[in-house]
């Protein structure tokens, strides 16, 4: 079977794929602007794929049926049931056979792009070290404070949440906690008006700039095991509890070497593939101009 020249369903397949990947919705839910953007992406993608599949490097590339089946399974797993998948296909006028053909086409394009990178040099330890020391700021881990909070909101429409009542309530909670801070999660579960109450007020490991400025400024001055005073934000009154502190630090080269090597290798591959595609498209354009000249 040849996948170089897809049938009428190819655009519908691409639209389904791009709608989900780029916009997180079904094709029928795209706005007019999004639809136009999707159509431009589809046109460009098909143009590139056609060029790749016609190039000499594609001649010897064969995609095994097992790889196509694996790709199909990954798509099917995105849906709650086989019926939901079939409904999505029906809505786009797609058939399973056509979908598998399009998957095979995509896999072949990717296989060709992988093949052209086969001769690229491996990223060496020296390459990794040079990048690390020239971009040291990328490997700084900010300070993190693991924190919990209790929120009492201000809402003048409710007697128990007027500014005065809310302040009285939060101060009473803080008073109970001052002698027993280990009860913070329990008090948060009972009294906090934030959804985090379900997790005992847990905010998790917080980095600077995450919370309201009023809370942020206080939290990053707190020590482990410390309670904050009553703090006010635009939504109400808070009490914070700092469970642990991780200071800012610089990741060592040894810590990040394997991941950084993979990242640089991928960047090298992407850059090479981009240049190769640009050259291929330029050659095709030149040939087309000569043919029509």
From Swiss-Prot:
The keyword 4Fe-4S does not apply. It is an enzyme of class 5 (isomerase). InterPro entries: Nitrogen_fix_NifM (IPR014282), PPIase_dom_sf (IPR046357), PPIase_PpiC (IPR000297), PPIase_PpiC_CS (IPR023058), PrsA_foldase (IPR050245), Trigger_fact/SurA_dom_sf (IPR027304). Residues 142-244 form the PpiC domain. Pfam families: Rotamase. Gene3D superfamilies: 3.10.50.40. It catalyses: [protein]-peptidylproline (omega=180) = [protein]-peptidylproline (omega=0). GO terms for molecular function: peptidyl-prolyl cis-trans isomerase activity. GO terms for biological process: nitrogen fixation. Belongs to the PpiC/parvulin rotamase family. Required for the activation and stabilization of the iron-component (NifH) of nitrogenase. Probable PPIase. This is Putative peptidyl-prolyl cis-trans isomerase NifM. It comes from Azotobacter chroococcum mcd 1.
């Amino acid at each position: 079977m040849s996948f170089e020249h897809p049938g009428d369903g190819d655009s519908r397949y691409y639209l389904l794929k791009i709608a989900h990947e780029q916009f997180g919705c079904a094709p029928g839910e795209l706005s007019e602007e999004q639809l136009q953007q999707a159509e431009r992406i589809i046109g460009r993608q098909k143009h590139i794929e056609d060029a790749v599949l016609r190039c000499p490097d594609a001649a010897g590339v064969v995609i095994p049926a097992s790889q196509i089946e694996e790709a199909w399974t990954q798509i099917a797993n995105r849906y709650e049931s086989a019926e939901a998948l079939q409904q999505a296909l029906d809505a786009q006028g797609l058939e399973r056979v056509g979908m598998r053909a399009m998957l095979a086409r995509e896999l072949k394009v990717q296989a060709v792009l992988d093949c052209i990178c086969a001769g690229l040099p491996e990223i060496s330890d020296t390459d990794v070290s040079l990048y690390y020391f020239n971009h040291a700021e990328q490997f700084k881990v900010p300070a993190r404070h693991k924190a919990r909070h209790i929120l009492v909101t201000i809402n003048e429409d409710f007697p128990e949440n007027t500014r005065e009542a809310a302040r009285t309530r939060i101060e009473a909670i803080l008073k109970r906690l001052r002698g027993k801070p280990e009860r913070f999660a329990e008090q948060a579960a009972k009294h906090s008006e934030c959804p985090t109450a379900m997790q005992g007020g847990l905010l998790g490991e917080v980095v600077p700039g995450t919370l309201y400025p009023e809370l942020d400024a206080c939290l990053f001055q707190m020590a482990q095991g410390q309670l904050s005073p009553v703090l006010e934000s635009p939504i109400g009154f808070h009490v914070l509890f700092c469970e642990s502190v991780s200071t800012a630090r610089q990741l060592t080269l040894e810590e990040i070497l394997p991941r950084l090597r993979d990242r640089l290798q991928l960047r090298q591959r992407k850059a090479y593939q981009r240049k190769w595609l640009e050259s291929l498209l330029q050659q095709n354009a030149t040939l087309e101009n000569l043919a029509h000249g």
